[in-house]
Amino acid sequence: MLTMAEKRNIFLVGPMGAGKSTIGRHLAQQLHMEFFDSDTVIEDRTGADISWVFDVEGEEGFRVREEGVIDDLTQEQGIVLATGGGSVVSKENRNRLSARGVVVYLETTIEKQLARTQRDKKRPLLQTDAPREVLEALAAERNPMYEEVSDYVVRTDDQSAKVVANQIINMLEER
């Protein structure tokens, strides 16, 4: 088990549908740490859901809010943070994540993303007739950024959230 001194912040990055929120909750529970989801914090602070923020402020307005939330949360101690899929597009966010905790990239396939997100109406970037093409374009843009910022990479395709959380804990303990 990780000691209190070893309980640095754990930041989860990766595409939508990779399991960041679900795995993050398992990690936080098992490590007795506090869990945050940056999208949920944005919704709490604005009093509106992410789709509304996108509709009213556009992606740019959303990203400004996201930068503020990530700046605030990464200054906490002993937390698990599930970031939004596009958070790594901001160089500021990448710098803060790298400097203030251990970054784990949760990797998944486009097929798994489609399966996990197809009924989710809370994903503004997928409200399109061509979600596969959107996910492929996002992967081409963002995957190199996830790799750049991450200390560890874990594939989430065919494993339960609990198994992935245990893998991450084992990796951190070996550190």
From Swiss-Prot:
HAMAP family: Shikimate_kinase (MF_00109). Its cofactor is Mg(2+). It catalyses: shikimate + ATP = 3-phosphoshikimate + ADP + H(+). This is Shikimate kinase. Binds 1 Mg(2+) ion per subunit. ATP binds at residues 17-22, 123, 159. PROSITE patterns: SHIKIMATE_KINASE. Belongs to the shikimate kinase family. GO terms for cellular component: cytosol. It is found in: Cytoplasm. Mg(2+) binds at residue 21. It comes from Photobacterium profundum (strain SS9). GO terms for molecular function: ATP binding; magnesium ion binding; shikimate kinase activity. Its EC number is 2.7.1.71. Pfam families: SKI. Substrate binds at residues 39, 63, 85, 142. Pathway: Metabolic intermediate biosynthesis; chorismate biosynthesis; chorismate from D-erythrose 4-phosphate and phosphoenolpyruvate: step 5/7. Signal peptide: none annotated.
